[in-house]
C-alpha cells in the first residue's frame, strides 16, 4: 500500500522514491512469511517519480506488479485497495485476510527488512511535518525518528512554527487529532504533524 490515504502525509511515497530496494526486499520477506505467490504495489498514478523508481528495481521480478490507482479518498484504506485490485468488496467487519490478502505500507515493509537483515525492532517512525512551518509549505519528510521524540523538536528541526497557529494535529487531516504541542510525542501510531 503506497496510496497515502491522508492527503497531507507523504513519507511512504518519499521512502519509495528514496529507497525502493528496502521496500522490495520487505515485500519479498512478507511473501515468504505468508506463502503469497503474488504481490501488488498499489500506488496513485500521479506519483510518477515513485512509480519510475519502483519499476526500475522490479525488472526481472515477475511476482511483484505495480497497480496504479485513482487519486481519491479513501483509496489508501485497505478495503478500497483490495476492491481496486481484485474487484472484491469486503464488509466493514471483514479484514483483508477474509479476501486472502495482507496489506502493508512502505514503512512497515522497510521495518520488516530492517528486522530480518539487521535484527532491529520497531523503535522509530517515519513522519511528515507540514503546515505553517518557517521551513516552507512543502512537506518535510523525516525518517526513522525515535519513538518518544517530542513533536515540538521535529517542528523546530523543520524551521519552527511560522507565526500564530491554530492547533497541531498529530496524524493526517482526516483521522488525526489535535494535541497539546508541549506534551505531544512520536508514537508507533504517529504519521504526521500538521500545524494549522
For each of these PLM feature ranges, what is it?
Residues 22-26, 53, 153:
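Long, highly charged amphipathic alpha-helices
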Residues 11-15, 36:
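Conserved "landmark" site that anchors the functional core of diverse proteins
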Residues 17-34:
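Histidine-anchored nucleotide/phosphate-binding helix
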Residues 37-151, 157-164, 172:
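Hydrophobic alpha-helical positions that pack around
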Residues 1-12:
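Gly-rich Lys/Arg/Thr-decorated short loops/hinges at beta-loop-alpha junctions or inter-strand turns
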Residues 125, 151, 158-196:
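Ferredoxin-type iron-sulfur electron-transfer modules and their immediate structural context
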Amino acid at each position: 500500500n503506497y496510496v497515502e490515504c491522508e492527503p497531507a502525509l507523504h513519507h511512504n511515497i518519499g521512502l519509495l522514491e528514496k529507497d525502493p530496494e528496502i521496500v522490495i526486499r520487505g515485500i519479498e520477506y512478507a511473501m515468504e512469511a505468508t506463502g503469497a505467490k503474488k504481490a501488488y504495489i498499489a500506488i496513485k498514478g500521479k506519483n510518477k517519480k515513485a512509480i519510475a523508481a519502483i519499476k526500475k528495481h522490479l525488472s526481472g521480478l515477475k511476482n511483484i506488479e505495480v497497480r496504479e490507482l485513482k487519486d481519491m479518498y479513501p483509496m489508501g484504506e485497505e478495503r478500497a485497495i483490495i476492491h481496486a485490485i481484485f474487484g472484491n468488496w469486503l464488509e466493514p467487519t471483514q479484514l483483508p485476510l477474509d479476501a486472502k490478502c495482507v496489506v502493508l505500507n512502505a514503512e512497515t515493509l522497510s521495518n520488516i527488512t530492517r528486522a530480518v537483515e539487521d535484527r532491529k525492532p520497531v523503535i522509530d517512525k517515519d513522519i511528515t511535518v507540514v503546515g505553517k512551518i518557517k521551513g516552507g509549505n512543502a512537506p518535510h519528510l523525516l525518517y526513522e525518528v525515535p519513538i518518544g521524540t517530542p513533536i515540538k523538536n521535529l517542528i523546530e528541526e523543520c524551521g519552527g512554527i511560522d507565526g500564530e497557529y491554530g492547533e497541531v494535529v498529530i496524524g493526517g487531516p482526516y483521522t488525526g487529532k489535535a494535541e497539546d504541542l508541549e506534551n505531544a510525542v512520536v508514537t508507533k501510531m504517529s504519521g504526521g504533524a500538521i500545524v494549522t
